[in-house]
Curated annotation (Swiss-Prot):
Enzyme Commission identifier(s): 4.1.1.23
Family membership noted in the UniProt record: Belongs to the OMP decarboxylase family. Type 1 subfamily.
Protein's UniProt name: Orotidine 5'-phosphate decarboxylase
PROSITE patterns: OMPDECASE
Species in which this protein is naturally found: Rhizobium etli (strain CIAT 652)
Subunit structure: Homodimer.
Residue positions of the active site: K63 (proton donor)
Length: 235
């Protein structure tokens, strides 16, 4: 798996037109895209199908959570769309239902542990009596037990999460900020180099590429940083 298969560019733009322009600009440099609520509700599901049909990989970031049957029905339909990854909140019953529904489809299910925009104060306000680190590890273990394909977590937790998950499950890390970039609304961030060194398998980068004056140049800079982490020049 090379760097292009590990870098996921978040299409965090409000319209299909802007998404199409960005994909065209990035060209063959980018293979993998994340599509979330903003674009889905602007007609993004059909766009996601079209991208997948063109050979791109799609991470559908829907963070599903509902009763078992509803989750299973949704996952069955998404599995038919040719998506590569799908998120749901890492609640055990929902994860087990999703795993059963996606069996044999090739869809990689990812459990969302704790949003990278949340810190201990945010969790306490929401009624959780655990710090982000402890909750991430607990949900990672629950995802492994449910048979999920991987989890989404901050790169700051990736090393310990890898110990929980073992060598084969995916660790997808948002909140990635290239060296020298602004953190935005993310509270638990890491550079591409450090995230891969910590054990992440896939990195989600949106704003530093999408909002860059030259998105293709920004994407190549991230890819180069990833290559340096995986294949250091002096080795």
């Amino acid at each position: 798996m090379d760097a292009r298969e590990r870098l996921i560019v978040g299409l965090d733009v409000p319209t299909i037109g802007e998404a199409e322009k960005l994909v065209s600009t990035l060209g063959d440099d980018i293979l993998f895209y994340k599509i979330g609520y903003q674009l889905v509700f602007a007609g993004g599901l059909e766009f996601a199908r079209d991208l997948a049909a063109s050979g791109k990989k799609i991470f559908l970031d829907m963070k599903l959570l509902d009763i078992d049957n509803t989750v299973a029905s949704g996952v069955e339909n998404i599995a038919r769309m040719g998506m590569s990854m799908l998120t749901l909140h890492a609640y055990p019953k929902a994860m087990r239902a999703a795993v059963e529904a996606a069996a044999g489809s090739g869809l990689c299910l990812l459990g969302v542990t704790v949003l990278t925009s949340m810190d201990a104060e945010d969790l306490a306000e929401a009624g959780y009596n655990q710090d982000p680190h402890s909750l991430v590890l607990r949900r990672a273990e629950q995802a492994r037990a449910a048979g999920m394909g991987g989890i989404v977590c901050s790169a700051a937790e990736a090393a310990e999460v890898r110990e929980v998950l073992g060598p084969d499950m995916a660790i997808v890390t948002p909140g990635i900020r290239p060296t020298g970039s602004d953190h935005g609304d993310q509270k638990r961030v890491m550079t591409p180099f450090d995230a891969l060194k910590a054990g992440a398998t896939h990195l989600v980068v949106a704003r530093p590429i999408v909002k860059a004056p030259d998105p293709r140049h920004a994407a190549r800079a991230v890819l180069n940083e990833m290559v340096a982490a995986r294949w250091p020049a002096n080795r």
